[in-house]
From Swiss-Prot:
Subcellular compartments: Cell inner membrane
InterPro entries cross-referenced by the UniProt entry: Membr_insert_YidC (IPR019998), Membr_insert_YidC_N (IPR028053), YidC/ALB3/OXA1/COX18 (IPR001708), YidC/Oxa/ALB_C (IPR028055), YidC_ALB_C (IPR047196), YidC_periplasmic_sf (IPR038221)
One Pfam short name: 60KD_IMP
Complex and partners: Interacts with the Sec translocase complex via SecD. Specifically interacts with transmembrane segments of nascent integral membrane proteins during membrane integration.
Organism: Glaesserella parasuis serovar 5 (strain SH0165)
Taxonomic lineage: Bacteria, Pseudomonadati, Pseudomonadota, Gammaproteobacteria, Pasteurellales
Stated name of the protein: Membrane protein insertase YidC
Membrane topology, from the record: Multi-pass membrane protein
UniProt keyword Protein transport present: yes
Compositional bias ranges of the Polar residues kind: 50-64
GN (gene name): yidC
Function: Required for the insertion and/or proper folding and/or complex formation of integral membrane proteins into the membrane. Involved in integration of membrane proteins that insert both dependently and independently of the Sec translocase complex, as well as at least some lipoproteins. Aids folding of multispanning membrane proteins.
Length: 546
């Protein structure tokens, strides 16, 4: 197999991958159903949905509406939350280390309730003695309107209190320096002579939206959960509209995902919880209900949970709950993507530039594949040396294809030539390319990460298309270095068009991925020149003699 045909196969594999990805985005039956469900749901009213509470294990479903209370803010070095005193819901979260836009000083707003988009984190107590009922939700009191982490402090707490019929409920949000993991705990002090029964819940509500992106950078916006039976599963808004999720599990979590960021409720991991979803009035809800907690007369009880609202930081999320880091979804290529991401971050820790880290990863990958690359070109050179004998066989055996095939296999065995030896490096490179594709798509570390000059965001496409054009030029040069021209005119036309086609495709790819492909092409050019030079010295002709 000559190198032009190798490029052709690689091109066809890449095109197939892109076509499949776009088909999934546009024509997958589930996606089409999701669009229809959202269109129907969004014709309904969205207003006043932020106060819905779920049904408890012994109560009917509640769809209560009421006005908002006061808002309280609590801020650390990385996170600012806005909490509504009515119900103690988190109605806004600002990620202070992430800008909304590349050249903006405005922090990225994850949770929000701005009249256009509803995305809030609710929690409360339902059940026999719950304070979130059809009659209304708890109106908490706070000691101040603003809480901020002071210099030298490692954590800060926002306590909200509510007293009713001799029972004091304290809902406390605790934030730690440098962390997006928020402890949300209830302390119940029962001053009555009766045993109380309450059931905690936490849920995320999000306006029904479609997943966004283009064929090169598709993104997912929707639900996901983890249980004792399923490590990680996406549960889209479409699936929520079709059927309400109800999963009983020990531990687990429920989340809403979007590109680079995630919010999730993580209940008590030692308790039996119910994960659920529902949709209505243009809003999708995913959350959990914990077990019933009994509070003895004149006794006290504490109920714990955590809320994550922040970036998809794999290392940090792995410390929060089992399988939470799987929200960084590498698809089927995860077993390649994870070590590649580790290598990428390791190199970046040394060179302090994500673009240089990508170049470093490319060099490592090409070095590992070099023995296979060398074997590929050596096999191709030997195949060219056998062309006169193969041509002689064609003339001798004519239309006797079976005899021709037998003699060719015999010849390959005698000369120790593998006719498919040129395919293996290509087949190995494509999974690596796909793994890198999803690594660059999912890694929040690359968001707004500069390289140099005009490349100020490696997660976005090249604004001036310089990298795609250079990549196309390098591919054209690599093609022209091929020692054997393609005889078939149709294949030759396809090959001539391949650099142009690749260039057009890569116009929309993240510049980090284009940088990888460009660097890979340049290294391949150098490797090919070196290998052919050494083969010529050994008497193996790398070009067909005219």
């Amino acid at each position: 197999m000559n190198s032009n045909r190798s490029l052709l196969i690689m091109g066809l594999l890449l095109v197939s991958f892109l076509i499949f990805t776009q088909w999934q985005q546009d024509y997958n039956p589930e996606i089409q159903a999701q669009k229809q469900a959202m269109a129907q749901a969004q014709t309904q009213q969205v207003a006043n949905q932020s106060s819905d509470v779920p049904a408890s294990s012994n109560a009917a479903s509640i769809n209560e509406q009421s006005t908002k209370g006061k808002t309280i803010t609590i801020e650390t070095d990385v996170l600012r939350l806005t909490v509504d005193t009515l119900g103690g819901d988190v109605v806004d979260s600002d990620l202070l280390k992430y800008n909304a836009e590349l050249d903006s000083n405005t922090p990225f707003e994850l949770l929000q309730d701005n009249g256009k988009v509803l995305y809030v984190a609710q929690s409360g107590l339902v059940g026999k003695n719950g304070i979130d009922t059809t009659a209304g939700r708890a109106q908490y009191q706070a000691t101040a309107e603003k809480f901020a982490l002071a210099e030298g402090q490692d954590e800060i707490a926002l306590p909200l209190t509510f007293e009713k019929d001799g029972v004091v409920y304290t809902k406390t949000f605790t934030l730690k320096r440098g962390s997006y993991n928020v402890a949300v705990n209830y302390h119940i002090k029962n001053g009555t002579a009766e045993t109380l029964e309450v059931q905690p819940y936490g849920q995320l509500k999000h306006t029904l939206v479609e997943s966004t992106g283009n064929f090169a950078m598709p993104t997912y916006t929707g639900g996901a959960y983890s249980s004792s039976e399923v490590n990680y599963k996406k549960y889209s808004f479409d699936e929520m509209a079709k059927a309400n999720l109800s999963v009983d599990t020990k531990a687990g979590w429920a989340a809403v995902l979007q590109h680079y960021f995630v919010s999730a409720w993580i209940p008590n991991q030692d308790a039996e919880n119910n994960l659920y979803t529902r949709t209505g009035n243009g809003v999708g809800t995913i959350g959990y209900r914990g077990p019933v907690t009994q509070v003895a007369p004149n006794g006290e009880a504490t109920i714990t949970s955590h809320l994550w609202t922040g970036p998809k930081d794999q290392a940090a999320m792995a410390q929060v709950a089992n399988n939470f880091d799987l929200t960084v979804d590498y698809g089927w290529a995860w077993f390649i993507a994870k070590p590649l991401f580790w290598l990428l971050t390791f190199i970046q820790s040394i060179v302090s530039n994500w673009g240089l880290a990508i170049i470093g990863v490319t060099i490592v990958v090409k070095t590992i594949l070099y023995p296979l690359t060398k074997a590929q070109y050596t096999s191709m050179a030997k195949m060219r040396m056998l062309q006169p004998r193969i041509q002689e066989m064609r003339e001798r055996f004519g239309d006797d294809r079976q005899r021709m095939s037998q003699e060719m296999m015999k010849l390959y065995k005698e000369e120790k030539v593998n006719p498919m030896g040129g395919c293996l490096p290509i087949l190995l490179q494509m999974p690596i390319f796909i793994a890198l594709y999803w690594t660059f798509m999912e890694a929040v570390e690359l968001r707004h990460a500069p390289f140099f000059g005009w490349i100020q965001d490696l997660s976005a496409q090249d604004p001036y298309y310089i990298f795609p054009l250079l990549m196309g030029g390098s591919m054209y040069l690599l093609q022209k270095m091929s020692p054997t021209p393609i005889a078939d005119p149709v294949q030759q036309k396809v090959m001539n068009f391949m650099p142009v086609m690749f260039t057009v495709f890569f116009l929309w790819f993240p510049s980090g991925l284009v940088l990888y492909w460009l660097t890979s092409n340049l290294i391949t050019i150098a490797q090919q020149w070196l290998i052919y030079r050494n083969l010529e010295k050994k008497g193996l002709h790398t070009r067909v003699k005219k």
